Regions:
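Helix-boundary and loop/linker segments of multi-pass membrane transporters
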Residues: 8-9, 39-46, 75-80, 113-114, ...
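Juxtamembrane helix-entry segments on the extracytoplasmic side of multipass membrane proteins
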Residues: 42-51, 151-163, 215-221
Length: 384
């Protein structure tokens, strides 16, 4: 089978898996729901609480903007406004496309709007995901005294401490041995039938560049603190919605719901994690004895609160920057034609034009030709 055929099979398989998972979780979420009581619960809720919930949600989003900027090298750190717009674009596409396609979209958007390197931006997204999971598990462990005594909660809290210790070990290993351990672990994966050597190589490269933040104690600590604060603020947003449904729960309930729904984002699913989000919220509320119908009505509203504003804001950003993004797309196409016709042998950079997509194999650092002729190339990675 050709490489293109393998890629298509992997893509179709991923979408199929996400669809199956979404249907399964949606079934779990709505099974046993009394739709008559559901309508009554939605009608009787106090939606004025959505105002403070939306304000704190916006504050948490801004903290994520600051967190993302911190992960960049001080020399290449993008400005706040392009970073904010790119993150909104990413949220928009995560809410309309499956498999967290918004992560790729915001990499492209930040490159177009802020001029950031695609390689470095990809690395920051990788480390963001790592920090998010670690922060949620750590908050789960810290919150154990205030959470209901449920077996799965305590087991997950212990896992959080184990991963925290693993992070310390990983940082020490990276400082002593560099990238060799990562390559040793990931290189054999290239032999698997559903992976490609270049993808594994890219994963090693992105992971290592992402861990630069962890190898700088100050940079890693600041980014992780922003991560913790953003999740805590988001927990307050969720708790304000709890007050709107008069569930009689403490702020700790908002934190537990955020932890459950946040960790559920790891699971491949449909756009906006429909079904998966609701099931996770119901599981969290079930620890407090909240009936499934009431929990489901709450999940619907808090999910809409976390989706609709970002869809609207993302559309606005895309519309305002339409010309910039179109010009960036045109530059990319011109770059492909130049690379395909001439290559970069003159400047000593090995470049291979990649089959169907026409993208260059190495396109991640700036390259400048002699002064008499400037190529329209934004980023080409230096030769190894």
């Amino acid at each position: 089978m050709s490489r293109l055929g393998r890629r298509r099979r992997v893509g179709y398989g991923s979408v199929l898996l996400a669809t199956v998972i979404t249907v399964a979780f949606a079934y779990v979420a709505i099974r046993g729901v009394n739709f008559g009581e559901l309508g009554q619960s939605l009608r009787e809720s106090n939606y004025w609480w959505l105002i403070p919930a939306l304000v704190t949600l916006a504050l948490g989003f801004f903290m994520r903007v600051l967190r993302w900027r911190v992960l960049f090298s001080p020399r290449t750190r993008p400005a706040i406004w392009p970073t904010t717009q790119a993150l909104l674009v990413g949220q928009f596409f995560n809410n309309i496309l499956p498999l967290r396609a918004g992560d790729a979209a915001r990499i492209v958007a930040l490159h177009s709007l802020g001029g950031s390197s695609r390689a470095e931006t990809t690395a920051t997204v990788v480390i963001e995901r790592f920090f998010d999971v670690l922060a949620l598990l750590l908050l789960l462990f810290i919150g154990l005294p205030w959470f209901p005594e449920v077996t799965w909660i305590r087991a997950a809290g212990i896992l959080g401490i184990a991963l925290t210790l693993a992070l310390v070990v990983a940082v020490v290993v990276l400082r002593v041995f560099g990238e060799r351990p990562v390559r040793f672990v990931l290189r054999p994966l290239a032999r698997l039938p559903f992976l490609f050597p270049e993808r594994v190589e890219a994963a090693v490269r992105n992971l290592m560049q992402g861990f630069i933040a962890l190898r700088s104690p100050r940079l890693g600590l600041v980014a992780f603190l922003w991560t913790l604060l953003s999740w805590l603020v988001l927990a307050m947003s969720f708790w304000f919605v709890v007050l709107g449904f008069d569930l009689g729960l403490s702020p700790a309930a908002g934190l537990l719901i955020v932890i459950a729904t946040g960790l559920s984002m790891i699971i491949p699913s449909a756009p906006a994690a429909v079904g998966v989000f609701e099931a996770a919220a119901i599981v969290a509320l079930s620890a407090y004895g909240i009936p499934q119908t009431n929990a489901f009505s709450y999940a619907l509203v808090v999910h809409a609160l976390n989706v609709l504003p970002f869809v609207v804001a993302g559309l606005v950003v895309l519309n305002v920057n339409r010309r910039v993004l179109q010009l960036a797309s045109g530059r990319a196409r011109r770059k492909e034609r130049i690379v395909g016709a001439q290559g970069f042998q003159a400047v000593g950079v090995p470049v291979r034009v990649g089959g169907n997509s026409g993208r260059t194999r190495d396109d991640e650092h700036d390259v400048t030709e002699p002064a008499d002729r400037q190529l329209d190339v934004d980023e080409v990675r230096e030769p190894r």
